[in-house]
């Protein structure tokens, strides 16, 4: 495997600050090489995309160890879209960068600008229902899958995360990084942290897809199931709309920017039908009551009250089972599974900053904190 210096080619773009009071925020694109454990790519050296953002006023070569953060995405949206929306103050990455953090976000295999297995270029590997939207433009009729199961798995995701964490640790000469994760990023980041507590400082988990009864060991891989999936603009909108419970919960202009960035992250998918986002199906296991119960890392967990993808009760279960004495659960009102793109995003961002810098939320190191609900 090539050295980290050779593996991570960086292209630097200067980004204008949103206000005259804020310093310039730099963006650096890295390519990190990993020996893949994805069954379809097993043993191959492949590249993962990592985005970095930091203030031009900061000397990153002398960064404080507790100020290095890595974002980990969920099941569908790549990290650079989820956490770096280029619209007013909606970039979580830029928010933390402005606060003096060196901020990274990674795409695991099959997502965004990271390596995509060839199996994701075959419409026959979609579910029969999703195949319908590509008949007859891409396939003449329904067809059988050409790969035997789900494309990626938690083990391969943990392997990807470890490669990026080690790259960051070597790059910034720190022992630990903090992880911020969304949705399926919960098992990815939380499971990784449980297995590598020596490399993780703190955790922030938004809507973690927790299953306290998850199997402790993986099934034979690849696990039978749909290989990968797509999401169209209409599906993206409908999924968000079903989670709206408050007036003016989000700015419609944000949705336009998010979808634009989503399609830009998948140039091949942009040419499928009216344009889709592609993502691998992922086999999960391991991040269960036993694993999370043994986790002692300080952890902030956030649940959106209107979330219809990872129910608040499921998030509360993760909080209850977590073994760390330093743990806070935020019950975030008027917020969906997409809260970082909604009007309460500023509350989330500020809470994450307080947690990362002080280990508290509103001054508390443990317990449940409500915020974001309409004032009576």
Predicted features along the sequence, with ranges:
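Short, surface-exposed "cap/lid" segments of acyl-processing enzymes
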Residues: 57-105, 115-120
């Amino acid at each position: 495997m090539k050295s980290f210096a050779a593996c991570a080619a960086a292209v630097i773009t200067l980004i204008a600050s949103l206000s005259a009071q804020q310093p310039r925020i730099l963006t650096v694109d890295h390519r990190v090489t990993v020996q893949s454990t994805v069954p379809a790519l097993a043993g191959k050296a492949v590249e993962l995309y990592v985005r970095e953002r930091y203030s031009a006023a900061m000397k990153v070569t002398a960064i404080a160890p507790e100020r290095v953060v890595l974002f980990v995405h969920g099941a569908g949206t790549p990290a650079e879209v989820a956490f770096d929306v280029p619209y007013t103050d909606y970039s979580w990455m830029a928010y933390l960068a402005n606060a003096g953090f060196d901020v990274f976000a990674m795409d695991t295999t099959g997502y965004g600008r990271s390596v995509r297995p060839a199996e994701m270029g075959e419409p026959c590997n979609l579910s029969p229902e999703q195949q319908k939207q590509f008949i007859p433009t891409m396939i003449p009729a329904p067809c059988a899958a050409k790969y035997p199961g789900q494309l990626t798995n938690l083990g391969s995701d943990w392997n990807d995360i470890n490669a990026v964490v080690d790259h960051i640790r070597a790059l910034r000469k720190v022992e630990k990084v903090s992880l911020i994760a969304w949705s399926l990023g919960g098992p990815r980041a939380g499971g990784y942290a449980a297995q590598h507590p020596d490399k993780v400082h703190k955790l922030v988990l938004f809507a973690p897809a927790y299953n306290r009864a998850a199997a402790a060991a993986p099934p034979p891989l690849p696990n039978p199931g749909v290989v990968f999936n797509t999401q169209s603009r209409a599906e993206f909108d409908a999924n968000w709309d079903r989670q709206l419970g408050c007036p003016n919960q989000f700015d419609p202009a944000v949705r336009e920017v998010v979808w634009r960035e989503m399609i830009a992250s998948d140039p091949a998918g942009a040419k499928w039908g009216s344009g889709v986002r592609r993502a691998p199906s992922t086999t999960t296991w391991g991040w269960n009551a036993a694993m999370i119960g043994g986790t002692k890392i300080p952890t902030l967990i956030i649940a959106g009250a209107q979330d219809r993808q990872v129910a608040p009760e499921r998030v509360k279960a993760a909080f209850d089972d977590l073994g760390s004495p330093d743990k806070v659960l935020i019950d975030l009102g008027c917020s969906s599974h997409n809260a970082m793109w909604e009007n309460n995003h500023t509350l989330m961002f500020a809470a994450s900053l307080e947690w990362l810098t002080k280990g508290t939320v509103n001054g508390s190191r443990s317990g449940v904190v409500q915020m974001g609900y309409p004032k009576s």
